[in-house]
């Protein structure tokens, strides 16, 4: 995959770049649904591949065959290049080595590449800088928060996510109801007990901040697991209701008491709209954007808004002209991976979109839409009741009997009526089976059963049961058109054609 540093950025000359980027943005929007489907299928096959069980197979050869097939469905070597396959493997491993809380946060952003994961983590580090805390995260999914010494006025606090050993006791909280642990907060080199200060987590802005959420959940988890143990580094005073300097209960007291009354990892924050529950209030706030339509992330260039920061980052590529995703077959570059994936189907011949009318398949959805118009053009007669189209007016007239209840075709034997003439013919066969024709019956009816065709055309050799059918057929060779329309004057060879006209 071509890196962004190697990408050539087109300059705006005479407004051409804006038009080109706008067209590409529209093209990408049409493929959003397909991208979501492809991403979901790829993740499903990845999970099947990782969680494959040997006991489900009859032997080692079948197990190997199924593993190969699952791996192929996940990595798609027929569509992806070697660089793209390596990128998928690195992305999976990168998400795996992240601690539970960070992993859950990153996966909520739905990153498509490792670069987007790095961007999300760098944003998190900057937000931790603003809080003035240093977060040191262990690979065993344990987290330790250390307070940073006050720096000089001209110095800016620095924070980074480092892998250090944390005190055992409480697991990291994440999607799978894991819990966090917080070590003693240090000022200088001297450890001291942890106490929540008034106003530390006040305000909606702090709850929405991922960095503050990490620290808050870790502190609450430590309090909930060890409310009165001195060995945990938190005194009995710290497990009591929170009070400010004047002895008044802190605003965070109610949240703290609520957290202590439940088991850690329980989903207690429920959505009033759809009933979905979350372990943290900040996650609920983010989820409510789906119902309220809130889009806090705005593009400074075009003013378009988004619900998630990562989507905004992907959108900005449209304005910068950056095209990091390049096709190895033809060299064409694209601003987004979804557009490249859609383009590569042209080379692979893969066709996902099928026409329900004729079964023809297409690589792109736009091709299917264009093809469907041809079916509509060939069927100009449309039913006003159900919008079904027909290529003949007579067929439309017969179809409308379904809605009106009219049944013009009646059986002479039993009096039963039908909407279509073909239905009547099928019904009459039941009477013919019950009453087979004898030698004394009409000759014409006997020929219908014996399939005898005594009348033969001298020009082409085609045979007919009835003489009138032969006469009408011979008019094709003579060019005679005896049936003429009284209104338009157009002439026809057969009466049925005039009736249809």
Curated annotation (Swiss-Prot):
User: Which stretches of the protein fold into C2H2-type zinc fingers, per the record?
Assistant: 269-291, 297-319, 325-347, 353-375, 381-403, 409-431, 455-477, 483-501
Which stretches are tagged as biased composition: Polar residues?
A: 180-194, 241-253, 437-447
Lineage, uppermost ranks? Eukaryota, Metazoa, Chordata, Craniata, Vertebrata
Location of the SCAN box domain? 51-132
This one is known as Zinc finger and SCAN domain-containing protein 12
Q: Name one Pfam family in it.
A: SCAN
Q: Please list where the region (Disordered) is annotated.
A: 175-194, 223-255, 429-450
Cross-linked residues for Glycyl lysine isopeptide (Lys-Gly) (interchain with G-Cter in SUMO2) are 20, 26, 197
Could you name the Gene Ontology cellular component terms for this entry? nucleus
Q: What does this protein do?
A: May be involved in transcriptional regulation.
* Compartment annotation: Nucleus
Tissue range of expression?
Testis specific.
Q: Which organism is it from?
A: Mus musculus
Question: Family, per the entry?
Answer: Belongs to the krueppel C2H2-type zinc-finger protein family.
This protein's UniProt keywords = DNA-binding, Isopeptide bond, Metal-binding, Nucleus, Repeat, Transcription, Transcription regulation, Ubl conjugation, Zinc, Zinc-finger
């Amino acid at each position: 995959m071509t890196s962004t540093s190697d990408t050539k950025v087109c300059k705006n000359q005479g407004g051409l770049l804006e038009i080109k980027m706008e067209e590409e943005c529209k093209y990408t929007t049409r493929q959003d649904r397909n991208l979501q489907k492809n991403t979901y299928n790829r993740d499903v096959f990845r999970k099947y591949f990782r969680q494959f069980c040997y006991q489900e197979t009859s032997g080692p050869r079948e197990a190997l065959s199924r593993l190969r097939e699952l791996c192929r469905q996940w990595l798609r070597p027929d569509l992806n290049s070697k660089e793209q396959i390596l990128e998928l493997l690195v992305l999976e491993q990168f998400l795996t080595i992240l601690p539970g809380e960070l992993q859950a946060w990153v996966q909520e952003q739905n990153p498509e590449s490792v670069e987007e994961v790095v961007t999300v983590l760098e944003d998190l580090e900057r937000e931790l800088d603003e809080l003035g805390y240093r977060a040191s995260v262990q690979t065993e999914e344990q987290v330790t928060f250390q307070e940073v010494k006050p720096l000089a006025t001209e110095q800016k606090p620095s924070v980074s996510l480092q892998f250090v050993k944390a005190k055992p006791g409480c697991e990291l909280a994440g999607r799978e109801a894991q819990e966090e642990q917080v070590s003693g907060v240090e000022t200088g080199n001297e450890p001291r007990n942890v106490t929540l200060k008034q106003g530390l987590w006040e305000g909606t802005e702090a709850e929405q901040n991922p960095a503050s959420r990490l620290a808050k959940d870790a502190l609450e988890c430590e309090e909930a697991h060890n409310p009165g143990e001195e060995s945990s580094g938190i005194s009995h005073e710290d497990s009591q209701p929170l009070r400010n300097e004047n002895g008044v209960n802190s605003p965070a007291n109610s949240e703290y008491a609520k957290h202590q009354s439940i088991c850690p990892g329980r989903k207690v924050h429920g959505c009033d709209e759809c009933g979905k529950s979350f372990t943290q209030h900040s996650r609920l706030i983010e989820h409510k954007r789906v119902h309220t339509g809130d889009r806090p992330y705005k593009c400074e260039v075009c003013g378009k808004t988004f619900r998630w920061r990562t989507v905004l980052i992907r959108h900005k590529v449209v304005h910068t002209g950056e095209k990091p995703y390049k096709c190895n077959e033809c060299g064409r570059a694209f601003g987004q991976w979804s557009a490249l994936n859609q383009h590569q189907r042209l080379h692979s011949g893969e066709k996902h979109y099928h026409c329900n009318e004729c079964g023809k398949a297409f690589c792109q959805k736009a091709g299917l839409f264009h093809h469907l118009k041809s079916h509509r053009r060939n069927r100009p007669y449309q039913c006003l009741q159900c919008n079904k189209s027909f290529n003949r007016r007579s067929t439309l007239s017969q179809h409308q009997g379904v809605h009106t209840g009219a049944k013009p075709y009646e059986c002479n034997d039993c009096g039963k009526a039908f909407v279509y003439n073909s239905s009547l013919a099928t019904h009459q066969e039941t009477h013919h089976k019950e009453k087979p024709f004898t030698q004394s019956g009409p000759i014409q009816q006997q020929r219908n059963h014996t399939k005898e065709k005594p009348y033969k055309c001298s020009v082409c050799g085609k045979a007919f049961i009835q003489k009138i059918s032969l006469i009408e057929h011979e008019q094709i060779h003579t060019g005679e058109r005896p049936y003429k329309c009284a209104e338009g004057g157009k002439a026809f060879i057969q009466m049925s054609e005039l009736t249809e006209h």
